């Protein structure tokens, strides 16, 4: 148990990058000696042209796995040679449907995960597949369709021989565990009180306790047993839509959530369903149709309120609407562990200003970092929630979807417009270099070994010092 505990608590001990944001989703690597200056014509070791996709590459000792989609709408899993970037194989995934997506999402947004040999991928428009190191399909498992108007975003996670996949949607949300060698279901738990979500879970190994997986979702954080799927502890206090992946230290988990309409001061007290039925339910059928609702704001926002898409508002739709209007955005530090409902017992601090929408927080060498659209970069004391420094990343005042990562005393931040900012890490961080690509970047950079990997819309680059 100790090696796993040390891995989860101190990600710098890990030299792998086998899943979204590397060791337990931390975004932290022990890579050293990476160049501050790089670009298409500077310090590029190799470049491989690829079809687009927002997923980040993941790595085994000799291979790189990533997902993509092409102009014909085909879904791909692609394997590269880690040494020279040559394509070793590419496999097409079935696409039985073409789900509605937000313009900021893509059909290949969830990142792959690898056990060091095999690759596991998840696509919104199919479900799960596993491939061997040479591209042979090991198994496939159709999942969905998903009632998520933005498309899915959470990546699969491995815990020993268990493959974990969260599937949060407007209705029918669930969390499931599968055997990584067969795809056979180990357990599945329904999440009826959860709407759409995009956050990738993280693992938690308490001293002397069983391995857990922590899942942020609408309004609450839940820790499940990896072995059984049983809820071990949970706490309320999150916003209604979670996109970033949390980060952890030994004692706390830092959960970021921002959703439109839930900034401080925007909360509303909405009447219970039973009360509005008495005055609005003209035909007395126990549901609310559009024409029965006098509030134009609800009618205008109908697609976000009618979660099950059946044309009327039922008790669940209304309760989720009430919860949504009461929710508040924030970066919250929760104390790890406990049993049962930890609401009101686990919050260490909460920060509610200048919050990113999509990028995950970064915890590196005792400092928390956030990057927000417009290039607003913030360092925070993880002990207190106090802002240490906040300023714009001059030269990269842009939209941000990729998450910050760190290695070798540097923090790397990539903007949608193709700017990659290199910062000197620290409470009073400094911008060292702004590197530019003539291409969009949605994928999170990977600092690994003696290379920095950058995926743009059309290529994967490996940078290093000659």
Show where each model-derived region lies:
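Noncatalytic, solvent-exposed loop/strand surfaces
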Residues: 14-466
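Bacterial N-terminal signal peptides
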Residues: 1-11
